[in-house]
């Protein structure tokens, strides 16, 4: 298996595939997606700044912009809440179209997966005492998004205090926007069980929250197992 780190402006990704050809295809897809996105932001800077769903002013917006707008509208967050998952999704879709049977793009903790074999996705919750756990992902039969948000780790905007809020969806852009919304819902006094109401949609397969020494799951979450999580493999800047 080939694992390659790839950075382009704010996009910091780890790409995993069985062939270098598919790695290069993923890089090209990331470059194309970012180029389209940056050109649209230059046309309408509000798209990058708004924290609420965005109504497209034009019909010919690029596919990544339309996808981000749709995903974010489901959870009442801004479109940039879906950017990492959308970029990862387009990259894995391009790999699969080129014949890849194993394709993973981890875009800063927002992961798009297409796999014909089981794999583990580590759960990183920062300073929480809940450590060394992973989701056991079985052959996906399609692309799967496993995306996370945190109010205590990393530079992304979150209005909550979850150490990690993870959402699983068939569309990584939807998983990303959902993770942002779920993370925002986790306040110090909130019932974790009640927080899941913000992602209770048909498009969401399951979700997980860790806050301090508490963990809660909702929906059809893959098996959680003990694992020696290799924190040096976490995609970060």
Swiss-Prot record:
Q: Which protein, by its recorded name, is this?
A: UPF0280 protein Mthe_1297
Give the species.
Answer: Methanothrix thermoacetophila (strain DSM 6194 / JCM 14653 / NBRC 101360 / PT)
Query: To which protein family does this belong?
Result: Belongs to the UPF0280 family.
